[in-house]
Protein backbone atom coordinates (compact mmCIF):
# COMPACT_ATOMS: atom_id res chain seq x y z
CA UNK A 1 0.00 0.00 0.00
CA UNK A 2 1.68 3.03 -1.39
CA UNK A 3 0.18 5.95 0.55
CA UNK A 4 -2.79 6.40 2.86
CA UNK A 5 -6.37 5.82 1.75
CA UNK A 6 -9.18 5.44 4.32
CA UNK A 7 -11.10 3.57 7.02
CA UNK A 8 -13.06 0.35 8.03
CA UNK A 9 -13.63 -3.94 11.74
CA UNK A 10 -13.36 -7.63 12.77
CA UNK A 11 -11.69 -10.87 12.00
CA UNK A 12 -10.87 -12.48 8.69
CA UNK A 13 -11.56 -16.16 8.04
CA UNK A 14 -8.72 -18.59 7.51
CA UNK A 15 -9.92 -19.07 3.93
CA UNK A 16 -8.56 -15.62 3.07
CA UNK A 17 -5.06 -16.95 2.48
CA UNK A 18 -2.28 -14.74 1.12
CA UNK A 19 -1.53 -15.31 -2.59
CA UNK A 20 1.39 -16.94 -4.35
CA UNK A 21 2.98 -18.29 -1.20
CA UNK A 22 2.94 -15.09 0.83
CA UNK A 23 2.54 -15.32 4.61
CA UNK A 24 1.83 -12.61 7.16
CA UNK A 25 4.74 -11.43 9.27
CA UNK A 26 3.93 -10.40 12.84
CA UNK A 27 6.70 -8.56 14.70
CA UNK A 28 7.63 -10.50 17.82
CA UNK A 29 8.06 -7.81 20.45
CA UNK A 30 6.57 -4.39 21.22
CA UNK A 31 4.70 -4.14 17.90
CA UNK A 32 3.25 -0.70 18.71
CA UNK A 33 6.47 0.99 19.82
CA UNK A 34 8.27 2.68 16.91
CA UNK A 35 12.03 2.55 16.65
CA UNK A 36 13.77 5.81 15.78
CA UNK A 37 15.60 5.82 12.46
CA UNK A 38 17.55 8.66 10.92
CA UNK A 39 16.97 9.84 7.37
CA UNK A 40 20.24 9.29 5.53
CA UNK A 41 19.21 10.44 2.07
CA UNK A 42 16.25 12.10 0.38
CA UNK A 43 15.38 12.10 -3.32
CA UNK A 44 12.57 13.87 -5.13
CA UNK A 45 11.02 11.26 -7.44
CA UNK A 46 8.19 13.45 -8.76
CA UNK A 47 6.64 16.79 -7.82
CA UNK A 48 4.67 15.16 -4.99
CA UNK A 49 6.73 12.00 -4.37
CA UNK A 50 9.86 11.60 -2.25
CA UNK A 51 12.05 8.59 -1.45
CA UNK A 52 13.68 8.48 1.97
CA UNK A 53 16.60 6.21 2.89
CA UNK A 54 16.50 5.29 6.59
CA UNK A 55 19.48 4.08 8.59
CA UNK A 56 19.39 0.37 9.49
CA UNK A 57 19.08 -0.76 13.10
CA UNK A 58 21.69 -3.00 14.71
CA UNK A 59 21.48 -6.27 12.83
CA UNK A 60 19.94 -4.68 9.74
CA UNK A 61 16.41 -4.75 8.37
CA UNK A 62 14.30 -7.83 7.71
CA UNK A 63 11.32 -7.69 5.35
CA UNK A 64 9.87 -9.16 2.16
CA UNK A 65 8.90 -7.20 -0.97
CA UNK A 66 5.28 -6.07 -0.71
CA UNK A 67 5.27 -5.53 3.05
CA UNK A 68 4.97 -2.12 4.69
CA UNK A 69 6.16 -0.16 7.70
CA UNK A 70 4.26 2.23 9.91
CA UNK A 71 6.28 5.46 9.73
CA UNK A 72 5.95 8.20 12.34
CA UNK A 73 6.54 11.89 11.73
CA UNK A 74 7.11 12.83 15.35
CA UNK A 75 4.67 15.45 16.55
CA UNK A 76 2.42 14.92 13.53
CA UNK A 77 1.28 11.30 13.29
CA UNK A 78 1.81 7.84 11.84
CA UNK A 79 1.04 6.36 8.43
CA UNK A 80 1.53 3.07 6.59
CA UNK A 81 4.14 3.30 3.84
CA UNK A 82 5.31 0.51 1.55
CA UNK A 83 8.93 -0.55 1.60
CA UNK A 84 10.24 0.30 -1.87
CA UNK A 85 13.50 -1.59 -1.59
CA UNK A 86 15.19 -4.90 -2.25
CA UNK A 87 16.01 -6.85 0.93
CA UNK A 88 19.68 -6.78 1.84
CA UNK A 89 21.95 -7.01 4.83
CA UNK A 90 22.90 -3.93 6.81
CA UNK A 91 21.80 -1.41 4.19
CA UNK A 92 19.69 1.68 4.49
CA UNK A 93 16.10 0.98 3.50
CA UNK A 94 14.04 3.17 1.23
CA UNK A 95 10.41 4.21 1.53
CA UNK A 96 8.70 6.14 -1.24
CA UNK A 97 6.07 8.59 0.02
CA UNK A 98 3.42 10.59 -1.82
CA UNK A 99 2.50 13.94 -0.27
CA UNK A 100 -1.26 13.60 0.29
CA UNK A 101 -1.85 14.66 3.90
CA UNK A 102 -0.33 16.09 7.07
CA UNK A 103 1.78 13.04 7.98
CA UNK A 104 3.02 12.30 4.49
CA UNK A 105 3.72 16.01 3.99
CA UNK A 106 5.92 16.00 7.09
CA UNK A 107 7.71 12.85 5.92
CA UNK A 108 8.26 14.28 2.45
CA UNK A 109 9.73 17.40 4.03
CA UNK A 110 12.21 15.36 6.10
CA UNK A 111 15.85 16.12 5.39
CA UNK A 112 18.95 14.02 6.08
CA UNK A 113 19.41 13.84 9.83
CA UNK A 114 15.69 13.91 10.64
CA UNK A 115 14.49 11.16 12.99
CA UNK A 116 11.36 9.23 12.02
CA UNK A 117 9.64 6.35 13.79
CA UNK A 118 9.47 2.88 12.23
CA UNK A 119 7.22 -0.06 13.18
CA UNK A 120 6.99 -3.36 11.38
CA UNK A 121 7.27 -4.80 8.84
CA UNK A 122 3.64 -5.79 8.53
CA UNK A 123 1.40 -7.59 6.09
CA UNK A 124 1.63 -10.13 3.32
CA UNK A 125 4.19 -9.98 0.53
CA UNK A 126 4.41 -10.72 -3.19
CA UNK A 127 5.41 -14.35 -2.58
CA UNK A 128 8.40 -14.31 -4.92
CA UNK A 129 9.77 -17.58 -3.55
CA UNK A 130 6.63 -19.40 -4.69
CA UNK A 131 6.93 -18.29 -8.34
CA UNK A 132 8.29 -21.14 -10.50
CA UNK A 133 11.64 -20.18 -12.08
CA UNK A 134 10.35 -21.03 -15.56
CA UNK A 135 7.20 -18.92 -15.26
CA UNK A 136 6.92 -15.51 -16.87
CA UNK A 137 6.20 -12.69 -14.42
CA UNK A 138 4.08 -9.69 -15.44
CA UNK A 139 4.33 -6.62 -13.20
CA UNK A 140 1.74 -3.90 -13.77
CA UNK A 141 1.99 -0.62 -11.86
CA UNK A 142 -0.06 2.55 -11.91
CA UNK A 143 1.48 5.75 -10.56
CA UNK A 144 2.92 5.42 -7.06
CA UNK A 145 1.80 1.78 -7.19
CA UNK A 146 5.28 1.00 -8.50
CA UNK A 147 6.69 1.71 -5.01
CA UNK A 148 5.39 -1.50 -3.38
CA UNK A 149 6.50 -3.38 -6.50
CA UNK A 150 9.99 -1.93 -6.81
CA UNK A 151 11.64 -4.48 -4.50
CA UNK A 152 10.00 -7.35 -6.37
CA UNK A 153 11.02 -5.93 -9.75
CA UNK A 154 14.60 -5.39 -8.59
CA UNK A 155 14.82 -8.94 -7.22
CA UNK A 156 13.32 -10.51 -10.34
CA UNK A 157 15.45 -8.38 -12.67
CA UNK A 158 18.61 -9.33 -10.79
CA UNK A 159 17.68 -13.00 -11.27
CA UNK A 160 16.93 -12.65 -15.00
CA UNK A 161 20.34 -13.70 -16.33
CA UNK A 162 19.92 -17.14 -14.70
CA UNK A 163 16.13 -17.39 -14.57
CA UNK A 164 14.40 -19.09 -17.54
CA UNK A 165 11.12 -17.25 -16.96
CA UNK A 166 10.91 -13.75 -18.41
CA UNK A 167 10.07 -10.50 -16.63
CA UNK A 168 7.65 -7.95 -18.10
CA UNK A 169 7.04 -4.58 -16.45
CA UNK A 170 4.19 -2.30 -17.58
CA UNK A 171 4.11 1.13 -15.94
CA UNK A 172 1.41 3.77 -16.21
CA UNK A 173 1.43 7.33 -14.89
CA UNK A 174 -0.67 10.45 -15.32
CA UNK A 175 2.14 12.65 -16.68
CA UNK A 176 5.74 12.08 -17.80
CA UNK A 177 7.18 13.74 -14.69
CA UNK A 178 5.17 11.36 -12.50
CA UNK A 179 6.73 8.14 -13.81
CA UNK A 180 8.22 6.47 -10.74
CA UNK A 181 11.88 5.34 -10.65
CA UNK A 182 12.42 6.41 -14.26
CA UNK A 183 16.18 6.34 -13.77
CA UNK A 184 16.07 2.60 -13.01
CA UNK A 185 14.08 1.32 -15.98
CA UNK A 186 17.11 1.01 -18.27
CA UNK A 187 18.97 -0.99 -15.62
CA UNK A 188 16.07 -3.44 -15.35
CA UNK A 189 15.98 -3.75 -19.13
CA UNK A 190 19.74 -4.32 -19.27
CA UNK A 191 19.26 -7.34 -17.01
CA UNK A 192 16.73 -8.81 -19.43
CA UNK A 193 13.39 -7.34 -18.34
CA UNK A 194 10.93 -5.97 -20.88
CA UNK A 195 9.91 -2.53 -19.59
CA UNK A 196 7.12 -0.47 -21.14
CA UNK A 197 5.85 2.92 -19.95
CA UNK A 198 2.76 4.90 -20.87
CA UNK A 199 1.24 8.14 -19.57
CA UNK A 200 -2.33 9.41 -19.60
CA UNK A 201 -1.40 12.80 -21.06
CA UNK A 202 1.77 14.57 -22.16
CA UNK A 203 2.92 17.99 -23.36
CA UNK A 204 3.63 18.71 -27.01
CA UNK A 205 6.88 17.16 -28.14
CA UNK A 206 6.75 14.18 -25.79
CA UNK A 207 7.98 11.15 -27.73
CA UNK A 208 6.85 8.43 -25.32
CA UNK A 209 3.71 6.33 -25.27
CA UNK A 210 0.40 8.01 -24.37
CA UNK A 211 -2.57 5.89 -23.33
CA UNK A 212 -3.85 3.50 -20.69
CA UNK A 213 -1.57 0.91 -19.14
CA UNK A 214 -4.04 -1.82 -20.16
CA UNK A 215 -3.15 -1.10 -23.80
CA UNK A 216 0.39 -2.31 -23.11
CA UNK A 217 -0.58 -5.77 -21.90
CA UNK A 218 -1.44 -7.50 -25.22
CA UNK A 219 1.83 -6.18 -26.69
CA UNK A 220 4.17 -7.58 -24.04
CA UNK A 221 4.35 -11.09 -25.46
CA UNK A 222 4.34 -13.07 -22.21
CA UNK A 223 3.33 -16.74 -22.07
CA UNK A 224 0.14 -16.88 -19.97
CA UNK A 225 0.57 -20.58 -19.21
CA UNK A 226 1.80 -20.64 -15.63
CA UNK A 227 2.57 -16.92 -15.63
CA UNK A 228 2.26 -14.85 -12.46
CA UNK A 229 1.12 -11.22 -12.39
CA UNK A 230 1.80 -8.66 -9.66
CA UNK A 231 -0.44 -5.58 -9.83
CA UNK A 232 -0.59 -2.36 -7.82
CA UNK A 233 -2.17 1.00 -8.53
CA UNK A 234 -5.51 2.80 -8.27
CA UNK A 235 -8.29 0.32 -7.61
CA UNK A 236 -10.14 1.11 -10.83
CA UNK A 237 -6.93 0.37 -12.74
CA UNK A 238 -6.46 -2.95 -10.94
CA UNK A 239 -10.01 -4.02 -11.79
CA UNK A 240 -9.42 -3.49 -15.51
CA UNK A 241 -5.88 -4.89 -15.47
CA UNK A 242 -7.00 -8.05 -13.65
CA UNK A 243 -9.88 -8.57 -16.07
CA UNK A 244 -7.62 -8.13 -19.09
CA UNK A 245 -4.94 -10.46 -17.74
CA UNK A 246 -7.57 -13.17 -17.32
CA UNK A 247 -8.80 -12.53 -20.87
CA UNK A 248 -5.21 -12.90 -22.07
CA UNK A 249 -5.05 -16.35 -20.48
CA UNK A 250 -3.59 -15.89 -16.99
CA UNK A 251 -5.15 -18.04 -14.31
CA UNK A 252 -6.89 -15.77 -11.77
CA UNK A 253 -5.13 -17.53 -8.89
CA UNK A 254 -1.77 -16.43 -10.33
CA UNK A 255 -2.66 -12.73 -10.19
CA UNK A 256 -1.81 -10.86 -6.98
CA UNK A 257 -2.92 -7.31 -6.23
CA UNK A 258 -2.01 -4.89 -3.44
CA UNK A 259 -4.96 -3.24 -1.72
CA UNK A 260 -4.93 -0.26 0.62
CA UNK A 261 -7.13 1.23 3.27
CA UNK A 262 -6.45 3.38 6.33
CA UNK A 263 -4.04 1.14 8.26
CA UNK A 264 -3.44 2.29 11.81
CA UNK A 265 -2.33 -0.53 14.12
CA UNK A 266 -0.61 -2.79 11.57
CA UNK A 267 -1.52 -5.91 13.57
CA UNK A 268 -5.17 -6.54 12.70
CA UNK A 269 -6.51 -5.27 16.03
CA UNK A 270 -8.12 -1.86 15.51
CA UNK A 271 -10.30 -2.70 12.50
CA UNK A 272 -9.73 0.58 10.65
CA UNK A 273 -8.48 -1.20 7.53
CA UNK A 274 -11.32 -3.71 7.23
CA UNK A 275 -12.44 -4.38 3.68
CA UNK A 276 -15.16 -7.01 3.56
CA UNK A 277 -13.85 -10.00 5.56
CA UNK A 278 -10.24 -8.84 5.37
CA UNK A 279 -8.15 -6.75 7.72
CA UNK A 280 -5.72 -5.47 5.15
CA UNK A 281 -2.83 -4.77 7.51
CA UNK A 282 -2.88 -8.47 8.44
CA UNK A 283 -4.56 -10.33 5.56
CA UNK A 284 -3.09 -7.93 2.98
CA UNK A 285 -1.99 -5.70 1.49
CA UNK A 286 -1.15 -8.37 -1.10
CA UNK A 287 -4.13 -10.62 -1.83
CA UNK A 288 -5.08 -13.00 -4.62
CA UNK A 289 -7.17 -11.57 -7.44
CA UNK A 290 -10.15 -13.94 -6.89
CA UNK A 291 -10.33 -12.72 -3.27
CA UNK A 292 -9.90 -9.10 -4.29
CA UNK A 293 -12.27 -8.87 -7.23
CA UNK A 294 -15.49 -8.65 -5.20
CA UNK A 295 -13.83 -6.22 -2.78
CA UNK A 296 -12.58 -4.03 -5.63
CA UNK A 297 -16.17 -3.21 -6.49
CA UNK A 298 -16.37 -1.24 -3.27
CA UNK A 299 -15.50 2.43 -3.84
CA UNK A 300 -12.34 3.94 -2.37
CA UNK A 301 -13.06 6.15 0.63
Describe each region flagged by the PLM.
Residues 75-78, 120-125, 299:
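Short, charged beta-turn/beta-strand-edge "cap" motif at the junction between a beta-strand
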Residues 242-243, 248, 256, 271-300:
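Iron-sulfur (Fe-S) cluster-binding segments and ferredoxin-like electron-carrier domains
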Residues 102-263:
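FNR/FR-type flavoprotein reductase catalytic core
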Residues 148, 235-237, 259-285:
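Local cysteine-cluster metal-coordination motifs and their immediate loop/turn environment
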Residues 2-9, 14-114, 173-175:
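Ferredoxin-reductase
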Amino acid sequence: MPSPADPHTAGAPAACAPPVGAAPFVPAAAPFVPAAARVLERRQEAPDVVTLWLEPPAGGWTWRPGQFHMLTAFGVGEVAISISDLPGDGRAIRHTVRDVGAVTHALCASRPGTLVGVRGPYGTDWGLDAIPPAADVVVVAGGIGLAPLRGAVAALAAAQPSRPGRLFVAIGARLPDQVAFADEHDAWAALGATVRVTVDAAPAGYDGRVGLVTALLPELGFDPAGATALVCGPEVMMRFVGRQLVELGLHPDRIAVSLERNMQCGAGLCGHCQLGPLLLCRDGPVVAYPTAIALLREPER
